[in-house]
Amino acid sequence: MFGVLNSSDHRAAVQQRNIPAFGRTSFELWTDNPTSNYRCETGGNGRDSGQNRVRRPMNAFMVWSRDQRRRVALENPQMKNSEISKQLGYQWKMLTEAEKWPFFEEAQRLQAMHREKYPDYKYRPRPKALPQKSDKLLPAASSSMLCRQVLVDEKWYPFTYRDSCSRAAHPRMEDQLSSSQPVNIANSLLQQEHHYCSTSLRDSPETLAMHLSADPPFYPK
């Protein structure tokens, strides 16, 4: 009889351990996680800085807005906290010096109490979180394609080029502009620019490096 009870207890214990996680409540899972308990006791980040951190004494505006913020939030529950702060800041600026003076006195009293309680206190602002840089390359924007106009025989012709192929095309463009055929220059320039753009993609890395190190773009006057 004693052996049967032990085996049944053993099976119950095994079944209890094999209960899937989705069959248990989130509170049970949270209490079984020692990391969660540690975060709860230390303030959320595994450190006790949340409980031991000394807050700054309130200034005059904070003393005044403490009750005003609560009142505005109750009157306008749909208003966001940022909008409430803007409204309170505007109302504070509209107050006269006589109306602000009682709050300055209260702030001075709170600061004196704070100095007595924390004589070694020094304000240390929290470092601002830096945005994480993405390692992924963004696609080329439409601004990488530049549009220029070429003046030929007192007429402006649109000329579109990309930075990757314009450096190789500009030396020959300069020679073309100095010739005496103004009518066909624009068409020949566009054809050469299309040819250099299409062939530069098939060039070797050495050839591309030579193109990039060529003379700067030529801009006709």
Curated annotation (Swiss-Prot):
Residues annotated as transmembrane: none
Protein name, as recorded: Sex-determining region Y protein
MF annotations from Gene Ontology: calmodulin binding; DNA-binding transcription activator activity, RNA polymerase II-specific; RNA polymerase II cis-regulatory region sequence-specific DNA binding
PROSITE patterns, per database record: HMG_BOX_2
Keywords: Activator, Calmodulin-binding, Cytoplasm, Differentiation, DNA-binding, Nucleus, Sexual differentiation, Transcription, Transcription regulation
Superkingdom as given in the UniProt entry: Eukaryota
Gene Ontology CC: cytoplasm; nuclear speck; nucleus
GO biological-process terms attached to the record: cell differentiation; male sex determination; sex differentiation
DNA-binding region of this protein: 54-122
Gene name of this polypeptide: SRY
Assembly information from the UniProt record: Interacts with CALM, EP300, HDAC3, KPNB1, ZNF208 isoform KRAB-O, PARP1, SLC9A3R2 and WT1. The interaction with EP300 modulates its DNA-binding activity. The interaction with KPNB1 is sensitive to dissociation by Ran in the GTP-bound form. Interaction with PARP1 impaired its DNA-binding activity.
Similarity section: Belongs to the SRY family.
Function comment: Transcriptional regulator that controls a genetic switch in male development. It is necessary and sufficient for initiating male sex determination by directing the development of supporting cell precursors (pre-Sertoli cells) as Sertoli rather than granulosa cells. Involved in different aspects of gene regulation including promoter activation or repression. Binds to the DNA consensus sequence 5'-[AT]AACAA[AT]-3'. SRY HMG box recognizes DNA by partial intercalation in the minor groove and promotes DNA bending. Also involved in pre-mRNA splicing.
Record Pfam families: HMG_box (PF00505)
Main localization category: nucleus
Cellular location(s): Nucleus speckle; Cytoplasm; Nucleus
